[in-house]
Amino acid sequence: MNFAVISTEIFILCLGLFAIVMDLVLPAKESHKSIGAVLIFALTGWFLYMFTLYQGPLNPMEPEAMAVIADKFFYQGMYFVDNYALFFKQMFILATVFTMLFASDYVQSVLRYKGEFYALLLMALLGMCVLASATDFLTMFIGLELMTISFYILTGARMSSKDSSEAAVKYLIIGSVSTATMLYGISLVYGLSLIHI
């Protein structure tokens, strides 16, 4: 297996673990600014690095082209990283960086667990990146659930607010119904087409 294909996902996962560990190690007053600055800097650097991963146009008739394409698959074709996937991953990373910048004052003044906010945001980003490269229903479902569960928790992160708790419960109920509906549709497609999930 070519683990370089999932290098972006590994990097985001490591950043999420870093945010949790640094929140435990650093004093409460310093943790927010330090963690936020490091994460924004790291994600921006990775965003720029991803420009080097783009592949030029390939001629499928050339023997070398098939080897290049095969090298972009991971775990028996369940995961594929092409230029489209790279583009959307860059957009997701950019959106996460802007979210961290705009939410900085809110995290500092309102939220009690600041490191967990960043870790959950990164786990949602990880789910989005998995969605961008998914080639089958199972991988797509895992990425979607990783993203939505992180958003459920982030919605209810303001524990002192009844509105936040109410919004989290409503979001959870609507998300559960939509997930069940999607799984039902996936099972119908699988049963009718006899393709691999």
Regions found by a protein language model. Give the residues of each.
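Alpha-helical transmembrane segments of multi-pass membrane proteins predominantly involved
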Residues: 1-195
